[in-house]
Amino acid sequence: RPSAAARRLATGQSGTLGIIFPAERNNLADLIFTEFLGGCVERAGDLGYDITLAMARGNISEEAVYRRTVRNARVDALIISSPLIEDPRPALLHSLGMPFIIHGRTRSTVPCPFLDIDNRGAFAAATRLLIDLGHRHIALLNGDCRQNFATDRLAGFRQAMQGKGIAVDRQLLCEAEMHEETAYHQASRLLALSQPPTALLCSSIGQALGVRRAAGERGMTIGRDIALIAHDDRLHELRAEAFDPSLTTTQSSIGDAGKRVVELAIDMLREPERPLPREVWPVDLVVRASTPPPAAA
């Protein structure tokens, strides 16, 4: 494998892809991000590339780190992760002439290559499954709705509910960072309502752990007294099939997404004349033991 210096001399490229994130997001402590990063690093290595990470911290803005990274010419392309709906990064990189690809989507007006999953279709299918089982009081524990994946999941949930003529109860809609502890407090509030949900739909398995704890404190059992579905990123540390009971999920591998994002980025560098890649993956709905009909039924 040629050295970075030899590659730069021969091609004008460094053989390195970059990922930049702000310190306050604490991405390195996030299992979903680290699984995505692992996929990126593995596939980049297979293809003879390296991945470099940079963090915006202290008084240095995220934009300043992007500008410095482009100016120093240490990476050939940047991978944008956790995009916001109104995200300034695509327009910034487009103006700087830096190739990039987004894991997810934004509403940016500049041409954006991306890889995403069908979040709307996935959560519509999960919600329809619960409705078909007889559930009408369904809670959604969503991610941060400043991000496109979360708004798509909410749209899919609403689409399924309204398609069956069921009113969406705003009391049963939650959004926040997808942490177990946050979901525990959300589920505790929901299950204490005078008319609590009979089913909950979560945006991550981490949230499902919080729901299970809140239900257990009320003497309720998932899969018997209450139904639960979560999105499964196929994390090595959290397996839906090892959940007790085994967890019904919408399923798509975040590690595989990391691998594919790297492939698409390198393809863009090698063949810049090709149309920008825009991929949307379908999501599997895997039914297991956590989705009974409503207890009263």
Residue ranges and their predicted role:
Residues G12, T16-R128, D132, L190-A192, ...:
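Alpha-helical recognition/docking segments in bacterial nutrient-uptake
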Residues G18-I20, I79, A139, L201, ...:
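Short, well-ordered beta-strand segments
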Residues S188-R189, L193-A297:
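Flexible loop/turn connectors
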Residues A23-E35, L53-E62, L115-A125, L141-Q186, ...:
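Hinge/beta->alpha junction and helix N-cap segments in small-molecule ligand-binding domains
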Residues R136-H137, V168-L172, I222-L228:
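Short acidic capping loops at alpha-helix termini that bridge into adjacent secondary structure
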Residues T16, P99, H137, T198-A199:
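Residues that mark the start of a beta-strand
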Residues S3-S14:
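Short helix-loop hinge/linker segments at domain boundaries
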